[in-house]
Each structure stands twice: as C-alpha cells, then as structure tokens.
C-alpha cells in the first residue's frame, strides 16, 4: 500500500507525483538502506527525506536554471549574459560573479541542507542525486549516488504497483 510509505503527518494527496515516484524508486533500488535524502535538480530543486522507509517531508526550491532565467529576465544589466559552468569563487565581472553565485552558491546550498538534515535527524542517510543539473553538482570523488534514471525507473515501479492492485 502506497500510504504505508508515508509518515502519518504527511498528506500524500498534496505531494507531487515526481517526488512520490523518486521515493518509491529509491526504496526499490536500495532496499537495504532505510533512510534516504533524494535530491532532484531540475526545473525545481527538491530534497525529499525518507526515514525507516517512510517519507517524512521535503524542500522545494527554484532550480538553478529557473532562478537564473528569472533573474536575467528581471535585472536589466544582465539580460544578454549566457549561462556557463564557471566554478571560480569570485567573478572579475558581472557575468563571472553571476556564474559563481549560481554554480558555487547552489552547491553550497545543497551541502548546507544535507548537513542540517543529517544533524537534525541524526541518521546515516543514503544520498541520491537525480535530475538534469545533478551531474554538475557532484563529482566522482563524492560518496553520493547519481541516478540519472531514478524518476524513469520509479515511473515503471509505480505502474507495476498500480497493476498489482487490479
């Protein structure tokens, strides 16, 4: 039963399907892990927390590109700037400073949320990244998992779950 995956204080009907699917996928792919932080970096940036196989809640933020496009549409001095993967800490001009903020700033935001969640819940979480921007946040040296196909696999798991009910 899908509701058995959700903490009693969470309203499943008010949770996006993509997030439900990612949680289901993580539990199916990594059944030996009990607690997860699933970070989906796409149009929106979402962090979803699973403790003892139960969805506890999450965070939704504008995605990196969504924020960037919104800023350049509203700030007259940066309308014609192109998005790049500049990783310098400080920019020497407006364009470089903007890229430092979006690239390093988003990475630091994610790292800070991870630290806060781990400190608050005192768990050993399996951290799973997915979404189009995820590959630029993590590198091969990190202990995090990158599953480009997490949502796609979850969709298949969810469809199988629905078929089993009938």
Model-predicted segments: where are they?
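Nucleotide/phosphate-binding catalytic cleft detector across ATP-hydrolyzing
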Residues: 1-36, 52-166
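Gly/Ser/Thr-rich loops at beta-strand to alpha-helix junctions
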Residues: 43-45, 135
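Short beta-strand scaffold segments in enzyme catalytic cores
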Residues: 38, 45-50
């Amino acid at each position: 039963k899908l509701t058995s995956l959700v903490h009693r204080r969470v309203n499943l009907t008010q949770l996006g399907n993509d997030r439900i699917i990612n949680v289901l996928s993580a539990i199916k792919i990594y059944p030996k892990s009990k607690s997860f932080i699933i970070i989906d970096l796409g149009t929106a940036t979402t962090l979803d927390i699973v403790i003892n196989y139960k969805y506890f809640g999450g965070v939704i933020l504008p995605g990196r590109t969504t924020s960037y496009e919104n800023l350049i549409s509203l700030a007259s001095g940066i309308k014609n700037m192109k998005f790049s993967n500049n990783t310098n800490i400080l920019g020497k001009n407006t364009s470089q400073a903007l890229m430092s903020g979006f690239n390093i700033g988003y990475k630091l935001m994610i790292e800070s949320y991870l630290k806060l969640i781990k400190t608050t819940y005192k768990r050993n979480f399996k951290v799973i990244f997915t979404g189009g921007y995820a590959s630029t946040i993590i590198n091969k040296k990190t202990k995090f998992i990158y599953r480009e196909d997490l949502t796609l696999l979850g969709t298949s798991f969810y469809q199988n779950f629905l078929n089993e009910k009938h």
